[in-house]
């Protein structure tokens, strides 16, 4: 594919990004050492290249590469390592001076530490203050706090978390004026603009405002967990993250309007650039939106200067600029997902689309039918290419990949293409009496249709496939190596780039089929807060058994186990139904798919309210309910049965089973697989099978 051939800026940007990623793995001194070693290596390579090939441009290229690594090492050291060192040395109880830089929500604030004790610092942190929800940008606070490392792993730029040690010693100095002439001030202003526009959308769209805000301004705060999970499982999360698709649709629609009224090209570029910047501020400078707008500016600049542009170079430069001015963005998974998906659409997708013929049949019906088929094929290939470029991130960070994304994106593509500009128009004219009514009605109906499609594909059986299997890890690593090599070398036929994709799909499907057919059932016991939860794994199937009379909700425990073992729950068995089980079931259903809930038949009237709540929750999330008698066994998977009595829990397998009495800590075993909690006084016996 020769990705870097005659794209020297692209190569320099790649080296910059690669060094940015690698340097995050080392401490402050390590960054300088690694940066210096990389520069020495580049210089040595340049010397040998000049001696052997006598290329005149090589010294300039190598100088640019050295400069990229050096700048990145310096930037990473100053803007990451030094704040890290300051932050971790401040851990403990102390008096702090902070300034509010963003009121993110009720009683929750993004702040910058100005002083810890007698030491002046500049550290971004998060602060929660019970009962205080009227702070604004620029307000300063002084209080005693317990300083700890931040728990929010999704935003590593927030290094510390502050817990008030003494609520009575909080002193607040209100800001006399807002200083928007700083990075924090600009971000605060953009959040104020986003909040104001979000309030306007709330008034226009009503109950559908949460989705509309996600589509238009990247504001997903009001989207509930269940809806967010549905978008993730259906592989359509990109719809709610302002990115190149949103910029293309909205700016493309604006460009069509300007063309229709015969506006000159240079004026069109100026208008679209200003509107794009305003839109970027409304999106609170989300990384994917920043990348898209910088790419747009780069393309327009090339059109003005050279009448042509190179999209790959624009993409690499835009990401490099983001990392340069915001070093902590290297930790932003969303930015890298946006970058990789866009790279795939720019590099690999054209090799498919260019070979697709444009149907020109004499029969109009056949001609348009063929065009629809070609459009469907291109839409599917866009999803396939994007998912393969995202495969490393999906494997390493999420452990699963959505198969439902292929048909779901195919169905949603025309709907979203219409919905995006329609929502933008509705947001503008929706408050005008009578005029806005049809726009609001049409937008809300399209949102309902989109959500129905997303929810349907989110619940498709095996729509999400786990990548946690050992064979999956091997296949993903091999694919990454082969695919990366093919991207940078010269290929006789560029269509060869699709060979690793096909090979991965076929090999993975074969391995998964063999694994499902031959895997023995495993029983995993997970203990948390004194309660036990059993995961019964049989190939790709997973069942969960809640076997404790514990008063704590175990939703987080089950979800953590799910992330390791499976992507959905086939059967969820509740042995001792209680109020905590209702909360647990609600939490689990919001974050994953549960196919069936199995509970014992109730014996006393006092259990009726609990059973009513369980049935109501099952109806809400479209879950089947099954009741079983005490003493009877329930088939969990093909080879495992569960038996409940008043005395014990029994797990029965093909050849052997173990019993653990209810009064003791539990033993679970099947064949060679077992999870045993040590207890010297434990007694268990082997049960005969009928």
Please provide the spans of the model-predicted regions.
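N-terminal leader/targeting segments
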Residues: 1-87, 163-165, 291, 486-491, ...
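Hydrophobic alpha-helical segments
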Residues: 1-26, 302, 366, 425-455
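Non-globular, low-confidence helical/coil segments that flank catalytic cores
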Residues: 32, 128-144, 171, 181-185, ...
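Membrane-interface helix/helix-cap signal primarily in integral membrane proteins
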Residues: 73-238, 602-604, 620-623, 633
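Divalent metal-coordination and catalytic microenvironments
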Residues: 98, 145, 215, 243, ...
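Membrane-interacting alpha-helical segments
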Residues: 187-190, 194-205, 258, 369, ...
């Amino acid at each position: 594919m020769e990705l870097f051939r005659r794209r020297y800026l692209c190569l320099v940007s790649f080296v910059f990004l690669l060094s940015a990623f690698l340097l995050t793995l080392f401490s402050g001194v390590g960054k300088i050492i690694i940066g210096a070693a990389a520069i020495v290596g580049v210089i040595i390579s340049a010397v040998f290249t000049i001696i052997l090939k006598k290329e005149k441009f090589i010294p300039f290229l190598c100088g640019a590469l050295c400069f990229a690594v050096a700048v990145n090492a310096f930037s990473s050291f100053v803007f990451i390592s030094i704040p890290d060192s300051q932050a971790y040395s401040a851990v403990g109880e102390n008096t702090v001076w902070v300034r509010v830089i963003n009121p993110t929500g009720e009683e929750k604030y993004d702040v910058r530490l100005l002083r810890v004790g007698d030491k002046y610092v500049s550290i971004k942190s998060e602060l929660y203050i019970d009962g205080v929800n009227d702070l604004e940008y620029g307000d300063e606070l002084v209080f005693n706090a317990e300083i700890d490392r931040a728990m929010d792993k999704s935003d590593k730029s927030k290094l510390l978390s502050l817990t008030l040690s003494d609520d009575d010693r909080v002193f607040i100095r209100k800001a006399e004026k807002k200083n928007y002439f700083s990075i924090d001030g600009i971000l605060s202003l953009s959040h104020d603009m986003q909040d104001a526009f979000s309030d306007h959308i709330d008034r226009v769209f009503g109950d559908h405002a949460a989705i509309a805000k996600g589509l238009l301004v990247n504001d997903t705060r009001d989207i509930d967990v269940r809806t967010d999970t549905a978008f993730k499982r259906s592989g359509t999360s990109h719809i709610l993250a302002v990115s190149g698709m949103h910029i293309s649709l909205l700016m493309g629609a604006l460009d069509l309007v300007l063309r229709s009224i015969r506006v000159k090209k240079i004026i069109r570029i100026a208008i679209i650039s200003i509107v794009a910047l305003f839109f970027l501020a409304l999106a609170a400078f989300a990384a994917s939106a920043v990348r898209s707008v910088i790419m747009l500016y780069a393309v327009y600049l090339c059109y003005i200067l050279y009448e042509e542009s190179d999209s790959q170079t624009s993409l690499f430069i835009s990401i490099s600029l983001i990392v340069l001015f915001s070093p902590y963005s290297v930790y932003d998974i969303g930015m890298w997902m946006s970058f990789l998906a866009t790279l795939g659409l720019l590099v690999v997708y054209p090799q498919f689309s260019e070979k697709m013929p444009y149907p020109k049949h004499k029969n109009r019906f056949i001609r348009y039918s063929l065009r629809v088929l070609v459009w469907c094929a291109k839409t599917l290939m866009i999803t396939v290419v994007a998912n393969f470029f995202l495969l490393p991130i999906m494997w390493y960070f999420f452990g699963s990949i959505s198969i439902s994304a292929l048909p779901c994106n195919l169905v949603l593509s025309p709907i979203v293409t219409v919905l995006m500009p329609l929502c933008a128009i509705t947001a503008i004219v929706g408050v005008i009496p009578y005029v806005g009514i049809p726009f609001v009605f049409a937008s809300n109906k399209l949102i309902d249709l989109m959500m129905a499609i997303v929810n349907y594909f989110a619940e498709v059986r095996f729509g999400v496939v786990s990548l946690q299997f050992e064979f999956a890890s091997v296949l993903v690593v091999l694919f990454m190596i082969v695919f990366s090599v093919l991207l940078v070398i010269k290929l006789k036929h560029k269509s060869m780039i699709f060979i690793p994709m096909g090979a991965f799909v076929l090999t993975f499907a074969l391995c998964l089929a063999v694994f499902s057919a031959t895997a023995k059932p495993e029983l995993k016991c997970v203990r948390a807060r004194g309660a036990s939860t059993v995961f019964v794994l049989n190939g790709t199937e997973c069942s969960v058994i809640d076997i404790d009379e514990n008063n704590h909700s175990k939703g987080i425990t089950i979800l953590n186990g799910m992330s390791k073992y499976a992507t959905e729950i086939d059967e969820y068995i509740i042995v001792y139904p209680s109020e905590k089980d209702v909360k647990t079931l609600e939490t689990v259903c919001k974050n994953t798919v549960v196919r069936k809930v199995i509970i014992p038949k109730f014996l006393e009237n006092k259990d009726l309210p609990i059973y009513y709540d369980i049935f109501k929750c099952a109806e809400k999330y479209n879950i089947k309910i099954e009741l079983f008698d005490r003493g009877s066994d329930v088939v969990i998977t093909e080879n495992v049965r569960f038996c409940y009595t008043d005395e014990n829990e029994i797990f029965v397998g093909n050849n052997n089973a173990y019993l653990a009495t209810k009064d003791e800590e539990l033993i679970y075993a099947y064949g060679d697989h077992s999870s045993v909690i040590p207890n010297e006084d434990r007694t268990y016996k082997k049960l005969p099978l009928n």
